Each structure stands twice: as C-alpha cells, then as structure tokens.
From Swiss-Prot:
Residues 1-60 form a transit peptide. Its main location: plastid. Inhibited by high concentrations of magnesium. The lineage of its organism: Eukaryota, Viridiplantae, Streptophyta, Embryophyta, Tracheophyta. Belongs to the terpene synthase family. Tpsc subfamily. Substrate binds at residues 245, 463. The Asp-Xaa-Asp-Asp (DXDD) motif is important for the catalytic activity through binding to Mg(2+). It comes from the Eukaryota. This is Ent-copalyl diphosphate synthase, chloroplastic.
Length: 802
C-alpha cells in the first residue's frame, strides 16, 4: 500500500504542453529529436503516489544501512494504515490559525500578562484618605480569586514560595480593612499549614526579592494581629537572609541613579523619598512595579504614582500584574518564538512592525522589558540586538560594553550576578558578530564557558523562568552554533522544547505571558512542519527516481550522498512553496558530485568534460536547437562517458527551466547554462572551487522574482569570493579529521564572519540575494562541522513527524 500525497499547486505535467497555446522560449533545447528531452524526472501530476516500495528499497540497501541506520524509523511511518498526508497549508483551519496569530500581533500594546495577587494586595492596602480602600476593585479581585485550598497564586503550577507570599499579602490586605473574614481565615490556615515547606523549595525558583519582601509582610501581619508561627525556624532563616541582603544594598547609590532596587522598594526601610522621586519612571511608576509604586504612594502621596496605579487597575479590571508595562519584552519574545517555531514567514509584515517598535526605543545603553526605562538588562538587550541585526537594522555591538566588567558580563549594569537565560541570549547574540567587534567575541567566549560549566554541573535552572526543556535548548545551541544552525533542524528540536502555555515566568510572583507562551503557536507550528515534511518526503521520492533513471550511481554518487544533498537543501529552504529552489539546489549538488567524482582527478579530465558540456550547447545552437548524440565528437578519451553525463546535466537544466517557465513564466535556460559554464571554468582550473557560488546562482534563478541583474554587482562578487573560500570539499575532509578539524573550522569561521557582516548589513534592495549567500554558506559550514549529528538530524527532520 502506498501513501497518497495530494499536491496543492502541483507542477504541470509535460502532457499539459500539448494542450496549451503557450509558446516555449527558443532557448529550451531539443535533444535526440524529441520535442523536449529532459533528464528523466517523472511523477508530475495533480495527485502523486509516494512509493513505499522505492523508500523500502532505499532503506534496505546495504550502503544506507551502513551509513544511515537511523532511517529505519521511516519504515514505521509507512505502515499499512498510514493516513493520507496533505501537502500544503491552505486548509480553512490553518488559515484561521494564521489569522488568529495575525490578530494578536496587530493588537500588541503594553503587554498581556497575568495578574499578581501579591501586587494587587499592595494596591488594595492604599487608603483613600477616609479609612476606606482607594481601590475597592482590588479588594474585590482578591476576594474573588482565592483558590480552593485557601491560597492565592498561580493556579496551575504549585510553588510554596509563590503561594505563601501571595497568600500572606492577600490576608494582610483583607484583615487591614476587616473585609471578607471567611477568605481571610482560609488563607491564614493555608499559611500556617505550609510555611514549613519552604525548607524544601528550590532557591533558584524563588521569586525576585522574596527574602526582603516576605519579612516585610510578616511585620505588617504581626502589627495587625494575624496569627502565624513567627518563631518558625524557616522564618528565622529568611529574616537572616534579609538582613544580609540589606547590608549589601548600596543605599547611597540607589538614591542617586536608577537601579533594579527601585523595583522592590516595599521591602526596604530608611528611604529618602525626596531623592527617590527624582528616579521615577516617565509613567509614574518605580521601575514598572505596581507593588513598589503602591508602597511609594503610601509614603509620598505622589500624584504620578497614583495615576500609574489607576491606569494599571483599569487596564486589568481590578487586579494588577507584578510588572507593567512589558511591551518591549513581549514584542521581542513573540518574534523569537515564531521564528524558532518555523512559522515567522506567515507574519512578515507584523514582525516588521514589532521590530520597528523595538528599534524605536533602542538606546546605546540597551533596553529592558518596558520602553523608556532608565535601567537596562542584558537579557532583553541581547534578544533585541540579535533580532534587529538579523533583520537588517543598524545596531552597534558597543551596547554590550555596558554589561561588561573586567572580562565578565552581568544581567544589569553595576551588578555582579548572571542568570542562565540572560547568558544564553547573550551567547546567541554574540554569534552575529561582525569582524573587529571584540566585545562580542569576548561575550561569546564568556557566555559559552558559563553555560558549558552550568551544564556540566547540571545547574541549567533559571531564576527568571520555569521552562519545559531549558537544558535541551542550551544543549542544542552549544553543540550547533548559529553558523551551522539550519532552520528546519532548529525548528524540529524547538517544537519538542517549547512549552507553550505551560512555561511560567518568575518575577515577584509567578506569572504568564499568553502572547509569548501560546499553545496556538505550537499547534500551528506542528501542522506547518508536518505539511512541509510531507512535501519534502514527496520530493525525496521524486529525487530518488531522478537519480535512478539517470543512473547517477555509475558516476560515483552513493545513495547516502543523495540523501545528504537533499537534506541540506530541505533543512535550509524548507517552505513548501519554494520547491523549485530546493530541488535545483539538491540536484545541482548531486551533479557537482557526479562530475567531480568522475572527471575531477586531473586537469585534463576536467577540461575534457568542460569542453563536452560547451560543445553540447554549441551544437544545439548551430543546429537550431535540434541535435543528436551522433553529432558529438567521440575521439577524446572517456568522451562517451562525458557525453552521457553532460546529457544528464543539460537535460536536468532543461527540466528546471521548463518547470519554472510553466509555473512563473520566466525563461532562465541560458542563464542556467552560463552559471554552470562559469563554475566549470573555476573547476577546470582548481578542481573544487566555485560550488557555493553555483548553488547560490541556481537558487536565485529559481526564485519567483528576477534577481539575476545582481550577478555582476560588486556586492555579489564579494560575497561569491567569500563563499567560494567556505565551500571547498577538501575542507570537509579536513574538518572530519581530528588532527586538522580545529584549524579548518577556525579558517571557515573567519570567512563566515565576513559573510555575516556583508549579508546582514545590506539594504533591502540586495537583501534577498545576500541572505541566500548566507543560507548556503551556513549549510556548507554545518556539513563540515556537524558530521556526528548528521544521521540523527536527517532522520528527525525528514522522517519523524511531530
């Protein structure tokens, strides 16, 4: 039984030619007297059956069993009851899912974030001036949002730190106004029964400032006669931690310049409010913290504080989050998630608006989670820097000098600590360094070593977020650097790592970001991945037929190499709609291998094949595009074999050109010949130079838009020179020998840095071409560096459905 694949937007069959009035350009050659003789590549119809037998033959071949044993998993995907897989993504459900995400992206404001019971309780404590709550809606929210066990906090993830500080704050607020005694007593009971459990909690997941804020709440509770075990050993330990931390707080500095201490004023004493009010944020808050701002208002009755709190309470219908706004954080992290999930192409316009927004608030000192902040952090700065640079915005690497001191990098200016995710995002950003950006070179070395050490100690736990698989994300990044990270490989792993709505952030309390951690994104990504994978499996079947029918094994191309060629193309150019680009890359790679394997040994044999190729084309033109193999000169050694392979090459180029003409009305036949002729001139002289440039040209020729006028552009020439130094087959061999691997990879890295600078700093007019160069270079770099991962990645990316 075979799997049936329904091809949406299928390539017209050759029989369509006879029934159409379209005139094919004269540059399509006619070989051996047939109307259009192309390298044989069948199975072009509206509904195509992907042969189980052919795939089974591939799996059972001794060669593949030796080289790629993990492909046996593909057998399990083609059982007797295998379902039909729809290739494409134009179903109504898929379109609606895309539309829903677009709606989210088009309506981003100050950030969607869950309400914090702790911060709401601080707002509820504010006196209107007449012994009544200034924010009765906050009191009401507390009363209506108690959990069934008597606590307050995140309802889906139980953390004693989170539940106890939220519960104590809410109990204090209700008792202060003598309201809702039943809820208050339930909360006290929960607190008394569970306070001892703090001893067993992981300090890494302790809320921000817990050791300062929690004792302060206990003092308020004691003052209003709330009966809790104040002499509990665990509370004594927390008091000791508070005193230690308070002694380390630079009181003089915190009153002069904005620091993260402004976020947690409610836990401090002996504050000079006249000085602190000068450090207030533009929106009236103290570093965007409702609880800190509520405490400040109680001490100062400042009208700007009150206005901020009123806006927050109104925005969240009575409650307030632990931090607000979070606009920059939300904009940046959404783009990152959509990009890593492999679905960003559906939202290009919306993503540009997101990044325009972030760039508008970018400063030389960096950014933080909210706009117009006087305090910046390395986490948001690194994430924004990476995305902005990737998308062509001009941002300076000097921004990271603000977070560096004596060779180390820190989360906040003036502090001396790191967080795993902060260093992870610094590491990711540092890999987009341009040559001569020493600060990023230092950042890469520091963050890599930091993460490596944390992984070795099994300490990949973060103080900012509880994630599904943070160790997996970091492990992937450490093993597959960005230069070698292919889009489909990253997405295949990230789909398994992304926790969606189950990921929880850690602030003063646990909180969630529904537009950042969204199950809808995950489901859309899974469906899109499976759609693309089905298309790839269909193409892989066609690709094998082309290989067999043209007997390419006779020219030294093994089946395992065939799969590697297709995989590199599909893992890089993965989109279903880019089939022409993907297939031309894969076939061109195989043909280069066949030609080099059969005729690359000596300059004479290379020259012989090159002459045969050019003679094929010249004869065709002399005979009005009709010629027969009998017209070819066969007096040179090996010319029969050369003639056959040249025929396969030209036939394949004809088919590529024909397919593009039928689907997009563009005739690129002569340009295909010229591109291969240019490659042969380099190959004839040097043996293995020019393959990278050839692949880029092939891909560009197959694009929907005509970019061929860039082939003579000085920028193109510079990029071509670089990629031809990266994409040298002899380098792969050296890279896989332990004694030369490090030296070879460093040499390639140097060229990759030049490539990144040229590709990412280019204007919109040349950007598509530049990114194509970068994509191809990354694929070659991946092949040289990641040989140990190749089998696993091929199996996972091409054959394992998500």
């Amino acid at each position: 039984m075979s799997l049936q694949y329904h091809v949406l937007n299928s390539i017209p069959s050759t029989t369509f030619l006879s029934s159409t009035k379209t005139t094919i350009s004269s540059s399509f050659l006619t070989i051996s007297g047939s109307p259009l003789n192309v390298a044989r590549d069948k199975s072009r119809s509206g509904s195509i059956h992907c042969s189980k037998l052919r795939t089974q033959e591939y799996i059972n071949s001794q060669e593949v069993q030796h080289d790629l044993p993990l492909i046996h998993e593909w057998q399990q995907l083609q059982g007797e009851d295998a379902p039909q897989i729809s290739v494409g993504s134009n179903s109504n459900a898929f379109k609606e899912a895309v539309k829903s995400v677009k709606t989210i992206l088009r309506n981003l404001t100050d950030g969607e974030i869950t309400i914090s019971a702790y911060d709401t309780a601080w707002v509820a404590l504010i006196d209107a001036g007449d012994k009544t709550p200034a924010f009765p809606s906050a009191v009401k929210w507390i009363a209506e949002n108690q959990l069934s066990d008597g606590s307050w906090g995140d309802a889906y993830l139980f953390s004693y730190h989170d539940r106890l500080i939220n519960t104590l704050a809410c109990v204090v607020a209700l008792r202060s106004w003598n309201l809702f005694p039943h809820q208050c007593n339930k909360g006290i009971t929960f607190f008394r029964e569970n306070i001892g459990k703090l001893e067993d909690e992981n300090d890494e997941h302790m809320p921000i400032g817990f050791e300062v804020a929690f004792p302060s709440l206990l003092e308020i509770a004691r003052g209003i006669n709330i009966d809790v075990p104040y002499d509990s050993p665990v509370l004594k330990d927390i008091y000791a931690k508070k005193e230690l931390k308070l002694t380390r707080i630079p009181k003089e500095i915190m009153h002069k310049i904005p620091t993260t201490l402004l976020h947690s004023l409610e836990g401090m004493r002996d504050l000079d409010w006249e000085k602190l009010l000068k450090l207030q944020s533009q929106d009236g808050s103290f570093l965007f913290s409702p609880s800190s701002t509520a405490f400040a208002f109680m001490q100062t009755r400042d009208s700007n504080c009150l206005e901020y709190l009123r806006n927050a309470v109104k925005r969240f219908n009575g409650g307030v989050p632990n931090v607000f706004p979070v606009d920059l954080f939300e904009h940046i992290w959404i783009v990152d998630r959509l990009q890593r999930l492999g679905i960003s192409r559906y939202f290009e316009e919306e993503i540009k608006e997101c990044l325009d927004y972030v760039h508008r608030y970018w400063t030389d000192n960096g950014i933080c989670w909210a706009r117009c902040s006087h305090v910046q952090d390395i986490d948001d700065t690194a994430m924004a820097f990476r995305l902005l640079r990737q998308h062509g915005y001009q941002v300076s690497a000097d921004v990271f000098k603000n977070f560096e001191k004596e060779g180390e990098f820190f989360c906040f200016v003036g502090q001396s600590n790191q967080a795993v995710t902060g260093m992870f995002n610094l590491y990711r950003a540092s890999q987009l360094a341009f040559p001569r950006e020493e600060i990023l070179k230092n950042a890469k070395e520091f963050s890599y070593n930091y993460l490596l050490e944390k992984r070795e100690r099994e300490e990949l736990i973060d103080k900012w977020i509880i994630m599904k698989d943070l160790p997996g994300e970091i492990g992937f990044a450490l093993e597959i650097p960005w230069y070698a990270s292919l889009p489909r490989v990253e997405t295949r792993f990230y789909i398994d790592q992304y926790g969606g709505e189950n990921d929880v952030w850690i602030g003063k309390t646990l909180y969630r970001m529904p537009y950042v951690n969204n199950n809808g994104y995950l489901e859309l990504a899974k469906q899109d991945y499976n759609n693309c994978q089905a298309q790839h499996q269909l193409e892989w079947d066609i690709f094998q037929k082309w290989y067999e029918e043209n007997r390419l094994s006779e020219w030294g191309v093994r089946r395992s190499e065939l799969l590697e060629c297709y995989y590199l193309a599909a893992a890089t150019i993965f989109e279903s709609e880019r089939s022409h680009e993907r297939m031309v890359w894969a076939k061109s790679s195989v043909l280069v291998k066949a030609i080099s394997s059969s005729f690359g040994e000596s300059s004479d044999s290379r020259r012989s094949f090159s002459d045969q190729f050019h003679e094929y084309i010249a004869n065709a033109r002399r005979s009005d595009h009709h010629f027969n193999d009998r017209n070819m000169r066969l007096d040179r050694p090996g010319s029969v074999q050369a003639s056959r392979l040249a025929g396969v090459l030209i036939g394949t180029l004809n088919q590529m050109s024909f397919d593009l003409f039928m689907s997009h009305g563009r005739d690129v036949n002569n340009l295909l010949y010229l591109s291969w002729g240019d490659w042969m001139e380099k190959w004839k002289l040097y043996g293995d130079e020019g393959e990278g440039e050839l692949m880029v040209k092939m891909i560009i020729l197959m694009k929907n838009n005509d970019l061929t006028n860039f082939f003579t552009h000085t920028h193109f020439v510079r990029l071509a020179e670089i990629i031809n130094r990266i994409c040298l087959p002899r380098q792969y061999l050296k890279a896989r020998r332990n004694d030369e691997k490090e030296k070879t990879i460093k040499s390639m890295e140097k060229e990759m840095g030049k490539m990144v600078e040229l590709a990412l700093s280019e204007s919109d007019t040349f950007r598509d071409v530049s990114i194509t160069f970068l994509d191809v270079a990354k694929a070659f770099y991946y092949f040289a560096l990641c040989g140990d991962h190749l089998q696993t990645h091929i199996s996972k990316v091409l054959f394992q459905k998500v």
